[in-house]
Curated annotation (Swiss-Prot):
Gene3D superfamilies: Winged helix-like DNA-binding domain superfamily/Winged helix DNA-binding domain. GO terms for molecular function: DNA binding; DNA-binding transcription factor activity. InterPro entries: HTH_MarR-typ, Tscrpt_reg_MarR-type_CS, WH-like_DNA-bd_sf, WH_DNA-bd_sf. Homodimer. The N- and C-terminal helices from both subunits stabilize YetL dimer via extensive intersubunit interactions. One of its GO terms (biological process) is response to stress. SMART domains: HTH_MARR. This is HTH-type transcriptional repressor YetL. Binding to the yetM cis sequence is clearly inhibited by kaempferol, morin, apigenin and luteolin, slightly inhibited by quercetin and galangin, but no inhibition is observed with the other flavonoids. Flavonoid binding may induce conformational changes and modulate interaction with DNA. The keyword Glycosyltransferase does not apply. It comes from the Bacteria. It comes from Bacillus subtilis (strain 168). The gene is yetL. Induction: Partially autorepressed.
Length: 167
């Protein structure tokens, strides 16, 4: 596989001679992963938009779909989806407008709110998921279970190691 706009291995190895601590193979892999992650984000953004969703909205719907009683607090949704409370509010406003979620005040403490997946939201997911999962399977069909397991482990390790970029 050759990704566009990435330095060729030959050029990377030439820089390795100029700069200390450059492992050409690591740099090529890192740049390839960086490029493919941008491409995946772009593809998925358009995919979800074409279906009246966004990645964020889809994530919220799935969290609620999997939750006990299809209900979670806005704070829990923000935490589980790794976004701010302000971002979750915007996502929930959009999902409520679409009729996919509703806000429910607790009976004992009216300040507490839970977000519930509506019947319409559940039906939308049940209609959407088979095709979505089929597309994911098509993307991954050339990989063995062992390769998938190894890749998931490697991505987890990579995720942890990205902390070296935090200042």
């Amino acid at each position: 596989m050759e990704l566009k706009h990435l330095p060729k291995y030959k050029h990377i190895t030439e820089h390795a001679e100029t700069y200390a601590n450059i492992d050409a193979g690591s740099l090529e892999l890192f740049l390839s992963l960086f490029d493919i992650s941008k491409k995946m984000n772009h593809v998925m953004e358009h995919y979800f938009a074409g279906r009246g969703l966004s990645e964020g909205k889809f994530k919220i719907l799935m969290l609620l779909f999997d939750a006990k009683d299809h209900r979670l607090s806005p704070t829990e949704l923000a935490k589980r989806s790794n976004v701010t409370k302000a971002t979750i509010t915007g996502l929930l406003d959009g999902l409520a407008r679409d009729g996919f979620v509703s806000r429910r005040h607790h009976t004992e403490d009216k300040r507490k709110i839970s977000i519930e997946l509506t019947t319409e939201g559940k039906a939308r997911l049940e209609q959407f998921l088979p095709g979505h999962f089929s597309k994911i399977s098509a993307v991954m069909e050339n990989y063995s279970d062992e390769e998938k397991d190894m890749f998931v482990k490697m991505l987890g390790d990579l995720f942890e190691r990205l902390s070296v970029f935090k200042d």
